[in-house]
Amino acid sequence: MPEEASHLFEIATPLGFSVRTTTDYWALIESKHPEIAGHRPAVERCLREPDQIRHSKQDNAVYLFYRSYPPHHLCAVTKRLNDDGFVITCYLTDKIKEGEKIWPTSA
């Protein structure tokens, strides 16, 4: 099967790069985080319209996109290599991580 056939989504982020994932990788995320199953539109919106974006404390190429998803926050973790962005994982959390907040920027 060609790689293009398994392409699930590609979302333009506020940081100026796009994030993508495949059907197979999305299935892996859903198996590891069953609370995300059926919530792909919310994850896509989190990438497109996050409440905030933070850099990972461990890896400067990793970005954590957060959006309120009461009573939790939805977190979409992405990695950017050159101009190629991809989803690492997604999950619900009670707390936003401590990484450096990079978006939105303060005036």
Regions found by a protein language model. Name each.
Residues 1-107:
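Ribonuclease/tRNase effector modules and their secretory precursors
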